[in-house]
Amino acid sequence: MNGTEGPYFYVPMVNTSGIVRSPYEYPQYYLVNPAAYAALGAYMFLLILVGFPINFLTLYVTIEHKKLRTPLNYILLNLAVADLFMVFGGFTTTMYTSMHGYFVLGRLGCNIEGFFATLGGEIALWSLVVLAIERWVVVCKPISNFRFGENHAIMGLAFTWLMAMACAAPPLVGWSRYIPEGMQCSCGIDYYTRAEGFNNESFVIYMFVCHFLIPLMVVFFCYGRLLCAVKEAAAAQQESETTQRAEREVTRMVVIMVIAFLICWCPYAGVAWWIFTHQGSDFGPVFMTIPAFFAKSSSIYNPMIYICLNKQFRHCMITTLCCGKNPFEEEEGASTASKTEASSVSSSSVSPA
């Protein structure tokens, strides 16, 4: 084994020199340069500095503007709540532990940080799935005369929380466990060991299949069908410039959505799966740290993609920030009006709002 396993931790360094210590009790500066811990703390501070205002503003703007309180925007609010979970439950903790160079909050703190970071990430992930399904059903109309209402939105919210809890809660009750990972300043699922009594193998397989592969396939299917529907509608109205413009905008937005999804989750999932299938192999602490924080940065990607690209929401947000007046209102109004005749495939119809 090219690491040191202890009670509730796994340090990716062989303890031949006798310097490896518990990440709950001692600084881990023997793993990487102390400057790396300072850089990690600064990065987490940046995520807090950006992630909290934009997600809080999302909640505030929706509450302030009645026209935004639509059933579909409930899912967008769910994304903001999930991101705030990650900010307060994960980012603040990691910033604090990075300043000390080890997981100073102990085993209980590791469970709390791991749970809230996982819960927030999974709520966000399944919210994206619900958005994808809603867009597919509404735009592609596999079910005739379907209208996404408040009851559907509430069921969607309940579904995201149920699936998120089904992933985040089991490690708290003995099916797998949360342990410090990477530079030992944040906690995640134990992909590293086959510790007796925790059934890590079955949980990791369950998590990858049910909480990564299936959501990924659903998102690709729904947005793939969505693009096909947009192309078919545009082909039927080739003389319409506004339709062609709408097609391009929708295509761009969907591509950004899928790329962001992959950037956030594929590096972390890929590295975690490699570690799981190559337990005992040699790897450094940074190997898991970098992809883990790509996944955490989804708290910034989500509001930028799903809200800032939404014209109505952006208008309301600017109005709120500018004390009730939008200096770009005339320009945005003209842009919106130019798409009226292509309403069946316009970006406002296909974007998540």
UniProtKB/Swiss-Prot annotation:
Classification of source organism: Eukaryota, Metazoa, Chordata, Craniata, Vertebrata
InterPro entries linked: GPCR_opsins, GPCR_Rhodpsn, GPCR_Rhodpsn_7TM, Opsin, Retinal_BS, Rhodopsin, Rhodopsin_N
Membrane side Cytoplasmic: residue ranges: 62-73, 134-152, 225-252, 309-353
Site (described: Plays an important role in the conformation switch to the active conformation): 113
Keywords: Cell projection, Chromophore, Disulfide bond, G-protein coupled receptor, Glycoprotein, Lipoprotein, Membrane, Palmitate, Phosphoprotein, Photoreceptor protein, Receptor, Retinal protein, Sensory transduction, Transducer, Transmembrane, Transmembrane helix, Vision
Sites carrying sugar chains: 2, 15, 200
Sites of N6-(retinylidene)lysine modification: 296
Ranges for region Disordered: 331-353
BP terms from Gene Ontology: absorption of visible light; G protein-coupled opsin signaling pathway; visual perception
Transmembrane segments: 37-61, 74-96, 111-133, 153-173, 203-224, 253-274, 287-308
Cystine crosslinks: 110-187
Protein name, entry field: Rhodopsin
Function statement: Photoreceptor required for image-forming vision at low light intensity. While most salt water fish species use retinal as chromophore, most freshwater fish use 3-dehydroretinal, or a mixture of retinal and 3-dehydroretinal. Light-induced isomerization of 11-cis to all-trans retinal triggers a conformational change that activates signaling via G-proteins. Subsequent receptor phosphorylation mediates displacement of the bound G-protein alpha subunit by arrestin and terminates signaling.
Post-translational modification: Phosphorylated on some or all of the serine and threonine residues present in the C-terminal region.
